[in-house]
Amino acid sequence: QPPKGISPDAHKDWLRVWEMLQLHAVHGFPLWEKDVHDVLAANLESLQSIFRAYAAASLEGSATEMDMEEFHDFVIEASLITDQYGFDSMSGQFTKANAGSNDTVLEFHEFLTMLVRISFFRANPQYGMRKGKDQKNAEKFDDVPLPGCLSEMLTEKVLPNARTDTYAQEFTETTLPLPEVQAALGGQLEQLSTFYEMVSAGRSHLQLDQWMEALSSKLLFSDLTIDGYVCRLTEPQAKAAFYASAATPASGLLPDELPVCIARTACDKYKHVSPLNYGAKVTGFLSNLLGEDDEEDVVLAATGGASSKP
């Protein structure tokens, strides 16, 4: 029976994907196998959309493979890290899910394998530690079994927090046209034109590597907490913003596409700084990119917090 919202053809594709999942090594298999199948099938469209969103940071438009950096973004944005189960442990699950293939990227079935594994070990962080030498104390720990831990992680963390592949389109339709965003960009058009000329080195298009180098030279790839607010920009986010803003990403950005790319990047970088409205996020990022302000200057101007600078 095809899951809700899935056509018979898509259902055939899903069954092919499901058969490729490597779950036999996870505790309790195969007792929960049908239940895990049903949980994944019920959320299939959302999980496909999330996978495409994080796998979108490559020029070939290859939203079919997720690399480790893209996976890191997913883990952080979906709030999967806990005190007892950090990113290093999760990246071990990335490697296990990818076992047997000769690449360092995850395809969709490997991504699903990894979600199931992470949900179990995240809910049972003691499990791996007590295996073997500590087996006699096993009963002291309460197992949180599958499929419950998977359902809970999806409904509480992954589905509400992770980006989907409509993210770029929603930005174009709802955030970009806001008067405050247009005013923030409009106030710096001349400086942006100069920036474009310099960074593109006079070419007809601004290339991805030129854009990444410009961000890197201003130290804008960072993960900071300032006055209690997370302020973060990663290379996959910057690439995704570039590709979403360019009509022909392989050629690069045209002059009128640069402001759009900057607005996207600004709203990603300052996404969690709630005292900044969208216009202020763009203004702040422009002052990072074109001026002398760093992230702390931008955030503290909004929060009124005390600077840590000498």
What are these regions (language model features)?
Residues 1-310:
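Charged interaction scaffolds used for protein-protein
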